[in-house]
């Protein structure tokens, strides 16, 4: 469900899809063919969230922000079930494994894979895969 926060509504491309049981709140931009699956929370309350083209946020995942950091998800990204992305940047063609947590200020480089259940601690830079 799309929800306003402080008068700001999510901006969802007509070709993107949000399941009814998901909550997409506030300053969120979803590009074409992006999808947010059941029971996810994507909450752009104090900063913005962007979900790139063809990226999918799978069941029970949470995307959130911090005052200092937005949450940016590039193109062709898969965020596995029950993952948490908090105030981080995930570049293009990345797989975020099920149940993993990526914390504030992290940058996950293009082509990287974050293992299921991993915790990527605050400020970590995961180098791109050439």
Each language-model region and where it sits:
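Structural signal for interior beta-strand "rungs" in well-ordered beta-sheet cores
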Residues: 5-7, 11-130
